[in-house]
Amino acid sequence: MSWSTVRADQFCTLITDGTHDSPKPQQSGRKLITSKHLKGHYIDFDSANWISEADYQKVISRSAVEQWDILFSMIGTIGNIYLENNPHVEYACKNMGIFKFSGNKADAFWMYYYLKSPQAKAYIQTHLRGSTQAYMPLGGLRDMPVPVPPQSVRNAIIAILRPVDEKIVCNNAINDNLLQQAQALYREMFINTTNDQRRTCRAEEYFDIAIGKTP
């Protein structure tokens, strides 16, 4: 069973990018996602701007994100990726690469894991452009060589990697929950609770503080 190598734009249905315009932020509407909002296994919608419905429709008419598309950060922190598994996508993208697969889940997962590989990361590093702010050109993404084994081999590799990915997501969720509990406990004990025995004091009353001296 031999492997072949094809360009990314031959493996994917389409490789495009989000809008290059700067829609005016709104108080409500639809979310506009940029590279900084990609957090690996999730998108940080809380810090993303709202844009108007008219601007949203304008953006998605050119580069709508669909289920099993891969988002790729092209500017700033380059190489962050996110695989969209939601069948109902209601956000737009700006300055971001979009690998499209026309709903082909198997191909999407193969490309997703390849983009995480040392080989793909090395290719990206050698094809960056820009002196003041580095960026990955769209042409570089399209020309990226992608190793493609037979489908049975791809399926076997994905079957190994996906459970590991799912475990990472689960552990991250547990860590986030523990952090929220710790923050809630801190607020309850030190901010929200009135305590007559609590007082403000100097650090030296509770700690031994020494200053280093020059020999």
Q: Locations of the language-model features?
A:
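Non-catalytic DNA-recognition/assembly elements of restriction-modification systems
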Residues: M1-G18, D143-T214
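Residues that recognize and position ribonucleotide moieties
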Residues: M1-S4, K31, V89-E90, Y113, ...
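A short glycine-rich beta-alpha junction/loop motif
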Residues: S2, M74, V89-G97, R129-I158
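Sequence-specific dsDNA recognition surfaces
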Residues: T5-K24, K36-Q67, E204-P215
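A generic structural signal for short beta-strands and their flanking turns/coil linkers
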Residues: G29, S47, C93-N95
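A short beta-sheet element
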Residues: T34-S35, E53-K116
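Short, positively charged
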Residues: A108-G140
